[in-house]
A protein has these predicted regions:
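Surface-exposed loop/turn positions within WD40 beta-propeller blades
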Residues: 17, 36, 102, 145-147
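Conserved blade-ending motifs and adjacent loop-strand segments that build the rim/top face
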Residues: 5, 53-72, 115-133, 159-172
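Surface-exposed, flexible loop/turn segments at secondary-structure boundaries
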Residues: 28, 47, 91, 146-147
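Residue-level recognition of short loop/turn positions
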Residues: 17, 111-112, 156-157
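Acidic, serine/threonine- and glycine-rich low-complexity intrinsically disordered segments
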Residues: 1-81
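Beta-propeller blade signature
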Residues: 1, 35-47, 100-111, 152-154
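Loop/turn-rich, solvent-exposed surfaces of beta-rich toroidal or solenoidal domains
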Residues: 66-143
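Hydrophobic, glycine-enriched assembly/anchoring segments
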Residues: 141-173
Length: 173
């Protein structure tokens, strides 16, 4: 259901209540017949998925963007039932999925079931999708068309700052 790669280590997490969430990738957004993706939840103390708290995000509009998510490429829990993620946008995929700028940085609210585009982080390819936490901020690696490097996002304020520029693909950090 998820990606076993180090840059995607945030795809399984627990919230403050001890509930387990698992992000699902949904064919990486490459199968237009099945774009289901999102989060499945096992509440603390339970052994089964809770269908009321699990969520197929492919049906949810992204605030500030014209398309919906077709995949969760990477995710990082930032607290208060919020997740930052790179989601794959099927409509932006090209003939070459390795270089297509089809990954969008978003803020996801698991409680309200909303998704918002993070302004200031460029669209990136499916390999430059690392997200880590530094203190209370999330740091995204992005290989954009006009900007390349590491970008800090403050989930409390929504502020984005480019921390450094890189030559080439910032796939891991």
């Amino acid at each position: 259901p998820t990606r076993p790669m180090s840059q995607c280590s945030g795809m399984i997490f627990t919230n403050e209540a001890g509930d387990i969430y698992i992000a699902t990738v949904g064919y990486f957004g490459f199968n237009p017949a099945n774009k289901k993706c999102g989060f499945i939840c096992i509440p603390k103390g339970a052994t089964e998925f809770d269908t009321n708290r699990s969520w197929d995000i492919s049906t949810t509009a992204i605030e500030g963007f014209e398309y919906k998510a077709a995949s969760v490429f990477s995710a990082q829990y930032v607290g208060n039932n919020k997740v930052v993620a790179y989601v794959g946008i099927h409509e932006l995929a090209s003939q070459n999925p390795y270089t297509a700028k089809s990954a969008l940085a978003v803020l996801i609210d698991l409680h309200a079931k909303t998704i918002k585009k993070i302004e200031g982080i460029p669209l990136t390819d499916g390999h430059s999708i690392s997200i880590n936490k530094v203190g209370t901020n999330a740091v995204f690696g992005a290989f954009g068309t006009d900007k390349v490097g590491l970008f800090s996002f403050d989930p409390a304020t929504g502020a984005v700052q480019q921390l450094l520029s890189t030559q080439g693909n910032p796939a891991y950090f």
